[in-house]
């Protein structure tokens, strides 16, 4: 710990915001099938709501097809209902104890709407990063005021926090740009 604030803790929190952003955009559907598409789906199972991946195995047998193998045969209809009600625009086809989910082509309007959602996720992550920065700066001001660190040390640490913030936000922008290209690719 550097006197004043814990830079490593701030970095860990900023990295957490980046990880959350990666997870959010991974669930956005692009032209290719990905098991992450079904991450937001929850199923009414055994008296409570559960993530789909806790009641079934999700695979990608073809580029435009997902396969969901339900572990408990009695859950097949609940899984189908959960996928249909998830607002992902998917129509599963029941095939015994599994479901096949063909992924329709994305039209231009849907692609633009997905890009907008990705931008919303990015903004949410940037706000979280700025909150971490603010917490760090407040800690520095308090340490400076309490005489724990001098003005020069406070200035140096605040520049480090700002540089870390800028780099983390640049990483969010880079990931957003990649996802945008992936979504808009026909």
From Swiss-Prot:
Subcellular localization: Cytoplasm
Top-rank taxon, per record: Bacteria
Listed Pfam families: RRF
GO biological process: cytoplasmic translational termination
GO cellular component: cytosol
GO molecular function, one term: ribosomal large subunit binding
InterPro entries, sorted: Ribosome_recyc_fac, Ribosome_recyc_fac_dom, RRF_sf
Keywords, comma-separated and alphabetical: Cytoplasm, Protein biosynthesis
Keyword Flavoprotein appears in the UniProt entry: no
Family: Belongs to the RRF family.
HAMAP family given in the database record: RRF
Entry-linked PANTHER family: MITOCHONDRIAL RIBOSOME RECYCLING FACTOR PSEUDO 1, RIBOSOME RECYCLING FACTOR
Record's protein name: Ribosome-recycling factor
Protein species of origin: Rhizobium leguminosarum bv. trifolii (strain WSM2304)
Organism phylogeny: Bacteria, Pseudomonadati, Pseudomonadota, Alphaproteobacteria, Hyphomicrobiales
Name of the gene: frr
């Amino acid at each position: 710990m550097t006197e004043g604030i814990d830079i490593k803790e701030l970095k860990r929190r900023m990295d957490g915001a980046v990880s959350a952003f990666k997870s959010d955009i991974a669930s956005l559907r692009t032209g290719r099938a990905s098991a992450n598409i079904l991450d937001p789906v929850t199923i009414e199972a055994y008296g409570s709501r559960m993530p789909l991946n806790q009641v079934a195995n999700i695979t990608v047998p073809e580029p435009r097809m997902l396969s969901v193998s339900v572990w408990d045969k009695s859950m097949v209809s609940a899984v189908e209902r959960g996928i249909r009600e998830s607002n992902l625009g998917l129509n599963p086809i029941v095939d015994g104890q599994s479901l096949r989910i063909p992924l329709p082509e994305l039209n231009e309007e849907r692609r633009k709407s997905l890009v907008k959602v990705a931008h919303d996720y990015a903004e949410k992550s940037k706000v979280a990063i700025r909150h971490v920065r603010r917490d760090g700066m407040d800690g520095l001001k308090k340490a400076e005021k309490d005489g724990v660190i001098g003005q020069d040390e406070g200035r140096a640490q605040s520049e480090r926090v700002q540089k870390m913030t800028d780099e983390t936000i640049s990483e969010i922008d880079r990931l957003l740009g990649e996802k945008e290209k992936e979504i808009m690719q026909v």
